[in-house]
């Protein structure tokens, strides 16, 4: 194939505020290779850096429960329900899961199919608290990784492993408890390490004994390369060569992550050997190389009959769900949409409904649309942690993913800047998405061929920046939301909040109790007569009476009947018992609360704080211990009103793009603690007003018009109104035809043609240092004749002869009038498809069989994000192998 493209480069760079070097200090020598010295130098209650609160989890790992009556697959039980470790990176390696001002950041939501996450780009002792918090909220353990190279053990790694082998296990266990880290992971494929592996094994056994009683999700992982003798033995299964590394019932040491060439000949004896050792064979994880498409052959179909688990790897810097998220388009929202689709298909099955599980195929897939992919739901149940005592903490979810292009609170817009904090993700539906035409319908025949669908959207939110939308047409369909184990009592208040944007439906909330899971009790939420209103978040509350008093809630579902062209957003589901106390006011660490960055986009800042508590130094203190659900972050420009800028679960926060009226404004930062029922908040603790950081100018320029006619005025300017003045020169055939000075300059040109633009002035680096430069932008200005068309301009607009606002009653008409520019002519204009796919059938173009073809197009790049993978054009054969 031939690809021809004309490239027109703009001079606008990406201006979104994002984390920069120095915002959060992890500390020197905190990599895995120095883990032993990190522990040696730490004492309970001490800090590694002043930014420790960005790395301390404030959510205790939840315990998960089993109830086979609310499973999709009834043949899975505690003995054969596989576990899964995602031994993969999180987000982009530069900032991992630290809070950021970048909307297009990773918000993993399929927690119910993951039992442990090995954060491949985080060291053993330094994992962002936001990621720890959301994983713990879902009952998932998290560990860092020691990436020991596939080579003879180096001196530095040998020193590290020797240090681990001789480490004080009491001190190490206190470290893991305090920071909330749930294990140790080793990419162990080194050799000549016979002198270090035995002490490390001894340490692992002692550590597990210390941690398991206080943290049931604690688990160490060992890549099954390096054996008991410090040499490499790949693809040997569990046997005499690695039994000591694995451990027995008395000394559980690690779980093994098998290399990718496992087969029936290895798995069957490995399961038997694990049982002989008194270990659960589910602690053996069959490795899946997501980058290379392994395992190959017929391996996937071996798994249902083997009592082993699944381990995902791939790759070193980005996980494969995230790396290729531009599959459906390059806009941030389309990449987010594709990422969610890829994960929903991969884990829940290619039809995004675990009831429709295709036959197991022996070909690895993780694309956004892959209806033949069996998904992880073919091997495991969707697990749930929703089982705690409602007297201690309510259950509340707003279906917020943890990122957004804006931030809403109670349905009201608070900021319009992008944000990311995955620690603030709400409880997600247990299944994505279990639709069926009857309650607990478990077969594909129970799913309407043309029924409802659900997806997360970033157009609106009751809380945060996203919500769950249900849409489509159906006669009768259930959406199973949550698998629960809550002991309800009379007086508990259940709230459902939704917004009916379009269409109509009869809608019921359906609840069922343990022992009668298939017998739902319905509570009406909406009648089909309700008029859609895009501005109305409808709140419905139900008080538990004799119907559920003393019963255990097992299932929460929605029943849609007579739905037609439905577009409905879910804003809240909650179960609250009684009233909860307002938390104490946070105490700000003034010395480490500071302004970080200042630019046209606003100001970035950091706040560190602590909560009053009675815990001993070095003892973990969770938000639940201080009667807090999360924290609200405020900013206030001197002389202006306070603004809510975001929320966090950590005892630290980052602010991005705080809006100010002037570049040298003083700003103070505030934080409040929100009660467990989200109904009250503490007083806001405020810092002093602080001087802004050094202003960093934006050197990008712009023209206020794209289509310009002879003698028509246009304005050239810096996009940054604070930028110092420059000299502007318009050049034609090497000669300056017009020039001017200023931050902006308005001029006109009489002759049709293409003109270069030269800008002479200060150009600024990230450090604020100025350098005098002359930049030339080739063919930046194009003057076109009247015959090629012009964009219309409206100079004045009236309604019923008035420029004032008018009010109309139903049936009344209004007379609109305008004065404007004559815009006749023929012109070519680009069409913005908003990342929607546009195409025609190849056969309609005569492209049949193996006929060759060419593709050509003009391409205008408005900007490419630095370090972000960008796809220009992609043609692929679905039968191709990987990597392509």
Question: Which residue stretches match the model-derived regions?
Answer:
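Chitinase-like catalytic core of GlcNAc-active glycosidases
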Residues: 76-269
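Extracellular/lumenal carbohydrate-interaction signature centered on repeated Trp-anchored short motifs
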Residues: 478-494, 532-533, 549, 662-663, ...
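Conserved aromatic anchor
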Residues: 602-625, 718
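Beta-strand-rich modules
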Residues: 656-682, 755-764
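Extracellular glycan-recognition modules
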Residues: 787-794, 835-884
